[in-house]
Amino acid sequence: LIESASSSLKGDEQTQEMVIVSLGNNRRMAIRLSDVVRLEEVKRSDLESSGKECVVQYRNEIMPLIDIPKIFHSAEGLQKADDTLNVVVHIHEGKSLGLIVEKILDIVQGKINNKRAIEGSNIMGNIITNNSVIDTINIKRIVQNFLKFAG
């Protein structure tokens, strides 16, 4: 259960807690912990369709699922044969949205380098952790695009 995230300021760079996830094909990415409410596992047998969306019943509401590996062309995402999906739950305007990832790997502290971000991109920058450069997912942008085309 993740209820909240902490962050600290050092100079003018912000250190934040980040959830490191795998998208398959050896691609790891980071999600700001402040964008995460919960980390869940969802049974594939619980998936349903509503309009063009894949959804799951979650805490007495219908939660749409966003296939993050598919967005980044990393893996099969929803197409994988696993019985269980790893889902990062995000709240947008009071509603839960599930972000499907291949695996939830770790929670680390990192400073987002926004200089590598591309305007209008699904990547908001990157962090360095364990001697690796990891792109940070722009959750706000992904959710906006999803809601624009959902239905």
Feature map (PLM): residue ranges:
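Conserved secondary-structure micro-motifs at functional edges
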Residues: 1-151
